[in-house]
């Protein structure tokens, strides 16, 4: 599932969703790309 990284820009309608939702923590070789902390899922982007 795609998600919006902070680097995608603030406008949800015009932003490109370059992140991927990952349950719990991001996989190896990926990093969390949003500052917002959620206990269940993170928005991750490939390093």
UniProtKB/Swiss-Prot annotation:
Keywords, comma-separated and alphabetical: Disulfide bond, Ion channel impairing toxin, Nematocyst, Neurotoxin, Secreted, Toxin, Voltage-gated sodium channel impairing toxin
Organism: Isohalcurias carlgreni
Classification via InterPro entries: Anenome_toxin, Myo_ane_neurotoxin_sf
Localization, UniProt: Secreted; Nematocyst
The protein's name: Delta-halcutoxin-Hcg1a
Range of residues in the leader sequence: none
Major localisation: secreted
MF term (GO), any: toxin activity
Domain of life: Eukaryota
């Amino acid at each position: 599932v795609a998600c919006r990284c902070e680097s995608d820009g603030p406008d949800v309608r015009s932003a490109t969703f370059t992140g991927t939702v990952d349950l719990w923590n991001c996989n190896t070789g990926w990093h969390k790309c949003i500052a917002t902390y959620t206990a269940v899922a993170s928005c991750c982007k490939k390093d």
